[in-house]
Amino acid sequence: MMKKIDVKILDPRVGEQFPLPTYATSGSAGLDLRACLDESVELTPGATTLLPTGLAIHIADPSLAAVILPRSGLGHKHGVVLGNLVGLIDSDYQGQLMVSVWNRGQQSFTIEPGERIAQMVFVPVVQAEFNLVEDFTATDRGEGGFGHSGRK
């Protein structure tokens, strides 16, 4: 059964002046989020800013969450990434989706109204249950970490 998620449009320009979020291809996992701005924003090297998306979300189902991820082209070509690296949207959050952007590049970057700035992916959630134990059942790896399995 397909799950439905309530995404509210807060800014009347979404769907009119700015396209609704869509999946770019049939295999796309992420929906593009756009900067709902009245005017361009210049992001100088090293600067961060919060950008509104014009969308609010309430996932409601605790077995789901959303993550906001950078768009690969912005980071690779321009050095513009998410200020918090990944945004996590819990199922009980009900506010506007804001995107923190950070210019880690060497040049100023201008964000235009309606520009695609990030992508949102819905993911399943598994919550951990903690149990106090004395030890674990032994495995071949044991406590080996940080390069334990080698490079080749």
UniProtKB/Swiss-Prot annotation:
Swiss-Prot/TrEMBL keywords: Hydrolase, Magnesium, Metal-binding, Nucleotide metabolism
Gene designation per UniProt: dut
Pfam families: dUTPase
Cofactor or coenzyme needed: Mg(2+)
Catalytically driven reaction(s): dUTP + H2O = dUMP + diphosphate + H(+)
Disulfide bonds: none
Binding site for substrate: 71-73, 84, 88-90, 98
Biological processes per GO annotation: dUMP biosynthetic process; dUTP catabolic process
Enzyme class: hydrolase
Known role: This enzyme is involved in nucleotide metabolism: it produces dUMP, the immediate precursor of thymidine nucleotides and it decreases the intracellular concentration of dUTP so that uracil cannot be incorporated into DNA.
EC number(s) recorded for this UniProt protein: 3.6.1.23
Organism: Cronobacter sakazakii (strain ATCC BAA-894) (Enterobacter sakazakii)
Pathway(s) annotated for this protein in UniProt: Pyrimidine metabolism; dUMP biosynthesis; dUMP from dCTP (dUTP route): step 2/2
Similarity field: Belongs to the dUTPase family.
Stated name of the protein: Deoxyuridine 5'-triphosphate nucleotidohydrolase
